[in-house]
């Protein structure tokens, strides 16, 4: 049975004081790490303080993106070495907002995935279709292409450690969400792609999240699906009480 992973993506929200207070409020109340991986992915500026605040607890801290190079003339960027040095555990890569607003390509995402593994970070690799692609019946093809390109060059052992987040673009921040059955079908397709590329053991081990307007009142419907191993949550992860409801739902019944 795969351990579930519930990750909050704060995006560009909170002040440092608010972020630290959030961690102080939740860190003693998340489920044990051997039952659920509870993760907060915060803005770069907060990571150092949040890692310190969460130290010794079952709450893990993640970043929302990174550069693929260890160092260099990349003004404004943050490297995997810097994140690892801070004690960050996870990093979100290839989020649709990064792809749409900052021109990240599948090739760039792949470079970042490879760099994450080189530096001992666990990537949460995002994929998902637009509304137009969905209406054209291209969901499986689009997602399969994104996953195949993102994972290129990895070993089966590395793939087992990765996390994939299926986030249909049309469901992010819109209040609309895929049906649990639809999401399960796409996540199952992702697992079949991983099996074809890296073998059944890797496919059985890799964890696949659903994301897209996940809330405390619908998360259990998604987690009840066989192929869904967690959730990547935006707005509903910003309040301590809501976040704790989400991670508590991650326990296997």
From Swiss-Prot:
GO cellular component, one term: cytosol
Main location, first listed in the record: cytoplasm
Keywords: Cytoplasm, Gluconeogenesis, Glycolysis, Isomerase, Phosphoprotein
Biological processes annotated in GO: gluconeogenesis; glyceraldehyde-3-phosphate biosynthetic process; glycerol catabolic process; glycolytic process
Active-site residues, Swiss-Prot/TrEMBL: 95 (electrophile), 167 (proton acceptor)
UniProt-annotated location(s): Cytoplasm
Modified residues annotated as Phosphoserine in this record: 213
Domain of life: Bacteria
Cystine connections: none
Pathway: Carbohydrate biosynthesis; gluconeogenesis; Carbohydrate degradation; glycolysis; D-glyceraldehyde 3-phosphate from glycerone phosphate: step 1/1
Record text on subunit structure and interactions: Homodimer.
HAMAP family per the UniProt record, alphabetical: TIM_B (MF_00147_B)
Protein name from the UniProt record: Triosephosphate isomerase
Native organism: Geobacillus kaustophilus (strain HTA426)
């Amino acid at each position: 049975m795969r351990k579930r992973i519930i990750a909050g993506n704060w995006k560009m929200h909170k002040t440092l004081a608010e972020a630290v207070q959030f961690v102080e409020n939740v860190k003693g109340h998340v489920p044990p790490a051997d039952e659920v991986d509870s993760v907060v992915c915060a803005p770069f500026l907060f990571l150092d303080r949040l890692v310190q605040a969460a130290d010794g607890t079952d709450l893990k801290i993640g970043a929302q993106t990174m550069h693929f190079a260890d160092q260099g003339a990349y003004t404004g960027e943050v490297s995997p070495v810097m994140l690892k040095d801070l004690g960050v555990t996870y990093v979100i890569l290839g989020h649709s907002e990064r792809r749409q607003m900052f021109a990240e390509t599948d090739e760039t995402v792949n470079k970042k995935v490879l760099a994450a593994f080189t530096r001992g970070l666990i990537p949460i690799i995002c994929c998902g279709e637009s509304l137009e692609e969905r209406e054209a019946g291209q969901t499986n093809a689009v997602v399969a292409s994104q996953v195949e390109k993102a994972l290129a060059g990895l070993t089966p052992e590395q793939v087992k450690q990765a996390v994939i987040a299926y986030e249909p673009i049309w469901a992010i921040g819109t209040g609309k969400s895929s049906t649990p059955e639809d999401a399960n079908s796409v996540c199952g397709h992702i697992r079949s792609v991983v099996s074809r590329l890296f073998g059944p053991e890797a496919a059985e081990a890799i964890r696949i999240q659903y994301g897209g307007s996940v809330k405390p009142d619908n998360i259990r419907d998604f987690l009840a699906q066989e192929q869904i191993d967690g959730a990547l949550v935006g707005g509903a992860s910003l309040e301590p009480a809501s976040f704790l409801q989400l991670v508590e739902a991650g326990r296997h019944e």
